[in-house]
Curated annotation (Swiss-Prot):
Protein name: Tryptophan--tRNA ligase
Name of the gene: trpS
Protein family membership: Belongs to the class-I aminoacyl-tRNA synthetase family.
Pfam family, one: tRNA-synt_1b
Main location: cytoplasm
Lineage, opening ranks: Bacteria, Pseudomonadati, Pseudomonadota, Alphaproteobacteria, Hyphomicrobiales
Keyword check for Nucleus: no
Residue ranges of the motif 'KMSKS' region: 217-221
A single cellular component GO annotation: cytosol
Positions contributing to ATP binding: 13-15, 21-22, 149-151, 208, 217-221
Species for this entry: Agrobacterium fabrum (strain C58 / ATCC 33970)
NCBIfam families in UniProt: trpS
Description of how the protein assembles with itself and partners: Homodimer.
GO MF annotations, alphabetized: ATP binding; tryptophan-tRNA ligase activity
Gene Ontology biological-process annotations: tryptophanyl-tRNA aminoacylation
Amino acid sequence: MNAFKPLVFSGVQPTGNLHLGNYLGAIRKFVALQEDNDCIYCVVDMHAITAQLVHSDLKAQTRSIAAAFIAAGIDPVKHIVFNQSAVPQHAELAWVFNCVARIGWMERMTQFKDKSGKNAEQVSLGLLAYPSLMAADILVYRATHVPVGDDQKQHLELARDIAQKFNIDFGGHIRNAGLGVNITVGDEPVHAYFPMVEPLIGGPAPRVMSLKDGTKKMSKSDPSDLSRINLMDDVDAISKKIKKAKTDPDALPSEVEGLKGRPEAENLVGIYAALSDKTKADVLAEFGGQQFSTFKPALVELAVNVLAPVNNEMRRLLDDPTHIDAILSQGGERARTIAEKTMNEVRDIIGFLR
């Protein structure tokens, strides 16, 4: 049971060009969630400096993410769209959570291990503490649900651990301050200030793979631009990339089982399924037995029809950066109001003078 008011939070880093995987795996899901939920969507620019401190185009990339949110259909009036650094309460709560969390928790994070590799002593403290800031991003609004991909599930589990430890460590203070609500964690009743945030995982294409290697996730950082379809790609670029996408010589199977061991075929079928809101089985019922020379043009047409309106609206918005800045500023003001209420209560719970 969760007695907290339902609230969805998610964020996207302003690093590299947004691509089809970001759209299908995250942004389109954000749009769908806003229909039945109160939502806060954040451009997490503070996270962007954890692995690379100096960026030449951070402001432009931040505007690009905001433009993509709005172009895809997110309503910045009904919901909140802002950039993380505009709300200093994120950093303040992250410091509290740094003191709640244990170093061992951070060092066990798979993403930290992957990014630090054998050079852990050379990476920033910010990269190690990334999950603590992510927990603060969510919990400074006491959000209850977060749409996440598989690569962020572990970080969300850590956010739950941090929330639970805070609730337990300060349980008496929370009650004495007249704050918190009664929830159930497992079978145990708990008086909690922070919710046990739940992941929202799923959708027809939660993982879109590289167009050049079906075993690797489509990535902003891949050196080959042919490996991904960027949201800012024009019709010619989309067509070229799909036509050059790696495939195998066999025809498409008639059943999903036949895609096993064929990662590139499975990726393209999965992309078609996601863009058309169909299942892979539906796609194979239509194209099974056909060669990629037939399937790829159909995929090009579908991708262009879905992405061109988003692309055009993004370009229109980016032509007027002051408008985007105004949207982010208004969203930041609304976000700060919520976050400051949380931090005032957290300060009281901890015992900070204010």
